[in-house]
Regions:
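N-terminal Sec-pathway targeting helices
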Residues: 18-42
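Short acidic catalytic loops
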Residues: 148-149, 170-189, 245-246
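Terminal peptide-recognition signature
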Residues: 68, 109, 148, 181, ...
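Membrane-interface motif at the C-terminal end of an N-terminal transmembrane signal
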Residues: 37-57
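Gly/Ser/Thr-rich loop/hinge elements
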Residues: 188-242, 280-286, 297-301, 307-308
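A short, well-ordered alpha-helical element
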Residues: 156-177
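STAS-typified acidic loop motif
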Residues: 135-161
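Extended, small/polar residue-biased N-terminal targeting/export presequences
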Residues: 76-143
Length: 336
């Protein structure tokens, strides 16, 4: 009885000691749980990560190739023969010693999965390592017709905003009655600054839709374009002026997407030659070694309901003198 009393007395005198012991057990338990979860996460990433381009350690050339092929599964042109084609390709790569050894096979397989608008680019050919495009839009106002030369564009976010703002600033003025958008020789690049700069001419509706091979669709509106560049959203309605768009055989890719943003509008007419026929949507993948995969994953549906799958956009007026005929049409519209 005396010992029990002494024990109780000691417990009453040292409650802090007992609390520390409990806290220590709790902390050790939490630490153990964290370590277990961390181990599971590492195991998960080690096993599944390569399929998504995530590597905890430098991948072998074979694992590198398999991670690229996993992405190619989403290519627009993969069909019933695709599984056999990629199996043969991976067998060829079993003897690869370096990442560079895989490039020729992956380049060929990329074209098979994504068609002519798809590219496997080595680190040396990565667009991010290329000089930025020095092209900037050209603006002229002649006889109340606003001439906008819209060239190809590649560059960072700051350059994209500058490109777009040069076009939008010209369109904010009230000293014109018609607009001529010249997309001849625009071979593409980034469509967002092109369309964003011209956005005040466009209605805030679906400009076009990406259509994936499983049938799902993703619409792009004027607001989506502006949001992508971080530019100010406006509720202003599209300017109702006659618009002529000029095209030729070098109007391609993002240049063609800019044409489609206008095609089908009642105040727009397209003059020139059929475009370059790169009318599909691409996904951009940065690969482990700095190479890049540009993969076509969707066809394009315009506002008229026409589906494009690397088909040329036909002008409304087929002509070898698009500028002269466009000017004549615009002046006629202005006089009405």
């Amino acid at each position: 009885m005396e010992n029990r009393s002494l024990f109780c007395y000691n417990q009453l005198r040292n409650p802090h000691k007992k609390g520390c012991a409990i806290m220590k057990k709790v902390l050790l338990g939490c630490l153990g749980t964290v370590l277990v979860l961390l181990a599971l996460l590492i195991g998960f990433l080690a096993y599944f990560g390569p399929d998504y381009g995530i590597f905890l350690f430098p991948p072998s050339p074979q694992d590198y190739a398999r991670s690229v092929v996993k992405k190619l599964d989403f290519g627009l042109y993969t069909d019933k023969d695709w599984e056999n084609e990629k199996k043969k390709a991976l067998e060829k790569l079993e003897s690869a010693k370096t990442y560079q050894d895989t490039y020729p096979v992956l380049e060929k397989l990329t074209k098979e999965a994504g068609g002519k608008h798809s590219y496997f680019l080595s680190p040396q050919d990565n667009p991010e390592n290329s000089p930025e495009s020095k092209n900037q839009p050209e603006v002229q106002n002649q006889e109340s017709i606003l001439y906008l030369k819209v060239p190809a564009f590649t560059g960072d976010a700051q350059a994209a905003k500058a490109y777009a703002k040069k076009l939008s600033a010209a369109l904010k003025k009230d000293d014109y009655q018609a607009v001529l958008v010249d997309l001849r020789d625009n071979t593409g690049g980034n469509m967002y600054p092109m369309i964003a700069g011209l956005s005040s001419l466009l209605p805030d509706e679906d400009l076009f839709q990406f259509v994936y091979k499983n049938g799902s669709k993703s619409a792009i509106s004027r607001s989506d374009i502006l949001k992508q560049l971080g530019l100010e959203q406006t509720d202003e309605k599209a300017k109702k002026v006659p618009i002529a768009v000029l095209t030729n055989g070098k109007t391609g890719s993002s240049g063609e997407m800019t044409v489609l943003a206008f095609k089908g509008l009642e105040n727009v007419k397209i003059f020139g030659q059929p475009t370059a026929s790169y009318t599909t949507g691409n996904n951009y993948y940065q690969l482990y070694d700095g190479a890049v995969l540009l993969l076509t994953t969707s066809s394009i549906l315009d506002r008229t309901g026409k589906l494009y799958k690397n088909e040329a956009i036909q002008p409304d007026v087929l002509t070898d003198q698009p500028l002269e005929e466009a000017e004549s049409w615009l002046k006629g519209q202005m006089g009405e």
